[in-house]
Amino acid sequence: MATENKILILGPTGAIGRHIVWASIKAGNPTYALVRKTPGNVNKPKLITAANPETKEELIDNYQSLGVILLEGDINDHETLVKAIKQVDIVICAAGRLLIEDQVKIIKAIKEAGNVKKFFPSEFGLDVDRHEAVEPVRQVFEEKASIRRVIEAEGVPYTYLCCHAFTGYFLRNLAQLDTTDPPRDKVVILGDGNVKGAYVTEADVGTFTIRAANDPNTLNKAVHIRLPENYLTQNEVIALWEKKIGKTLEKTYVSEEQVLKDIQESSFPHNYLLALYHSQQIKGDAVYEIDPAKDIEASEAYPDVTYTTADEYLNQFV
């Protein structure tokens, strides 16, 4: 669906930003990316490196070859940020968890520029107005919720993108710590394994984000990505994998009490990942009814989008 909407991605070389850039180019949008002069930090702790192997430098080269318009700047440089925003119609922030509160600077720049049709703040997870998460992720979700309130108070046009569980974080290893591939012998399951979760590939997040960006119906609404074939319990996910490898895994179920204890006693990234897994697999933070007045279910709004199913995704690991 080609469109003349000019889209600016902030955080274009991050785990999800890269996929939004690629989806924007594929959709035919004039695509802009704000990049800093500084090289990527190879020592920066990452949650799942295997899901995003490209370096910043490789991505920049790739973007140039695709025709992405690279703008030099930084969200901490108000003047260059305003200048970049004035060139586009839609701003999508894909900054990482450590920069959530810095989005007030983007909001200020958008207000000054005065031309933005829609702002997507950095969310790309569960709905931060509907969760029972624990620390250390709770603070991040609360920061995202506070940014929502600032956006609304300032009258900035917005779309919130709630995509829940990236396959690169939750599915490629069946939510097991210290491995990047699905287990073939034993598997640990948090809770009873019967709580529904919502899985989506990072590439499909990019696709749905750009569809939502180009859709006028998403103005001042939240878009929820809960794809029918990927709305699965952990037990269902494991059953898919067992069928593929022709083997039944030895299962260990961990109580919520023990999970909370493990979170408190672990360091990053284990505590963060466990808290994310706890949110989806035990508390069921992907299970809720949407309000049509302010919510849009992506699979219903864009039924023509062909997405990667959890079953298909796991084929690469057989």
Swiss-Prot record:
EC number annotated for this UniProt entry: 1.3.1.45
Binding site for NADP(+): 11-17, 36, 44, 148
Matches recorded under SUPFAM superfamilies: NAD(P)-binding Rossmann-fold domains
InterPro entries per record: NAD(P)-bd_dom_sf, NmrA-like, NmrA-type/Isoflavone_red_sf, PCBER-like
Listed pathway(s): Phytoalexin biosynthesis; pterocarpan phytoalexin biosynthesis
Inducing factors: By fungal elicitor. Induced by the bacterial pathogens Pseudomonas syringae pv pisi and Xanthomonas campestris pv alfalfae.
CDD domains: PCBER_SDR_a
A biological-process GO annotation: lignan biosynthetic process
MF (Gene Ontology): 2'-hydroxyisoflavone reductase activity
Catalysed transformations (reactions): (3R)-vestitone + NADP(+) = 2'-hydroxyformononetin + NADPH + 2 H(+)
Residues of the active site: 144 (proton acceptor)
Family as reported in the entry's similarity comment: Belongs to the NmrA-type oxidoreductase family. Isoflavone reductase subfamily.
Function according to Swiss-Prot or TrEMBL: Reduces achiral isoflavones to chiral isoflavanones during the biosynthesis of chiral pterocarpan phytoalexins. The reduction product is a third isomer, which represents the penultimate intermediate in the synthesis of the phytoalexin (-)-medicarpin, the major phytoalexin in Alfalfa.
Protein name: Isoflavone reductase
Organism annotation: Medicago sativa (Alfalfa)
Gene name tied to this protein: IFR
